[in-house]
Amino acid sequence: MRLYDTRARGLQTITPSTPRHLTIYACGPTVYRDAHVGNMRTFLLTDLISRLAGMHGWTTTVVQNITDVGHMADDTGLGGVDEGQGGGEDRVLRQAATEGSGALAIARKYEEAFHSDLSALNIHPADHYPRASESIPEMIELIDALLERGNAYVGTDGSVFFDARSFPEYGAISGNRLEDLRPGHKFDVEADPVKRFHADWALWKKAPDTRTQLVWDTPWGVGYPGWHTECSAMSLKLLGSSIDIHTGGIDLRFPHHEDERAQSNSATGSDVVRHWVHAEHLLFDGRKMSKSAGNVVLVRDVIERGLDPLALRLAFLQHRYRQQMNLTWQVIEGAQKTLERWRSKVAEWANSPSAPMCADYREQFLAALDEDLDTPRALTVLRNLEKDATISEGSKFEFFAWADAFLGLDLARTVGQTPLAAEIPDDVQALLEERAAARAAKDFATSDRVRDELAAMGYVVTDTPDGQVLN
């Protein structure tokens, strides 16, 4: 398996630090609103890497954080739909005020919606979903270590800051150099007098007296964590000081992942993350999704249009994860047609005698995925197999079922299901109606005779509380 490593600026062979066991940390949602389809495409990346690892016979441990505190409205790098709005207010607190609810109630509401969206897209759940609000002791421990090592200091306002100049490798992920950064470049417009250097960032922020929610007492007073602190603390707690892959959206390269890397490496004295893998932006109708443009699309919007959410998953798979994608309703509708055709074919092929998969097609499929998750090429392998008249239907069924372990499209959904009434032959439909009338009249002899006639024609009738089911 080779993936594009943002820090290495090239494809890297992925070799787990523990043989045949891959560890992945994925930046998760800030739970103050519903995740849009662009966020979901990023979350899909981790699922694809994990599924491919499984196809190689590896096990995985996946950790995805839940940010329910500390992500300020002016923090950069989220790629959200309201970036930069609302000054320095905590996003969760701001939404809680808008909805007239408690902060944690808001966080749990949108966390639940996030898990529902993951399920709709058949994204396998992570092994751990640590919440920032429940990881405060680990953050305090991390900050203590950074202060002790000289990588952090207490500012003039009582907040604790990371000393960016104490980490010489800063900028290795994004290419930004500290000496080139100036106030206003994703930092305060003017240098902050409470910090030693304008590029330093808050590990722990002193809370104003007016803030009564999402605050904790620490050795540095009452306050709340910085956004970047959270990921370092949670990843180190659950995965230790050697993490194979860290995923996230391309927007997170700087400053979030640069800051996280500086914190984790400084605290442990080692290079914690081996590979940084990022998903590219998603546009909708050629534009970045935003409230002002009115083009923010959620998973539930797809469902409400009568489309299968797995058609959205297929639409994502039709593009490379690190290729900017322009999603439209036409693209999703086209994917829906492909999905319906494949499910119909798989159900048809399931009735054929089983046959081994074609080794050549299997090798082509894995080769495409192993080369930086080239999902468009992998889908082309399926299309070629579908049309290949030299391959038996039983073999096609086995291949599509095997490939779906990675694709996650539920291609066998209609196998064994009753055909639609319109597709049932007229003579079979007439017999079903005759049998239903016989059962209503308690003429069980006729009912049994008709059942036997249908069986001779290759149909099995099952009686349920809702009526007859034909297979």
Predicted features and spans:
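Short, well-structured beta-strand/strand-turn elements
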Residues: 59-61, 150-156, 460-462
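N-terminal, positively charged nucleic-acid-binding surface of large information/translation enzymes
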Residues: 8, 17-118, 470
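Non-catalytic interaction-recognition regions
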Residues: 87, 100-105, 111, 115-141, ...
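Alpha-helical recognition segments enriched in aromatics with Gly/Pro capping
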Residues: 1-32, 47, 109, 115-116, ...
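Short glycine/proline-rich turn/loop motifs
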Residues: 27, 94-95, 211-217, 363-364, ...
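Conserved beta-strand edge residues that scaffold enzyme active sites
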Residues: 67-68, 132, 160, 468
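Anion (oxyanion) recognition and catalysis
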Residues: 54, 147, 455
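Structural preference for alpha-helix termini/caps and helix-kink/transition segments
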Residues: 288-291, 295-471
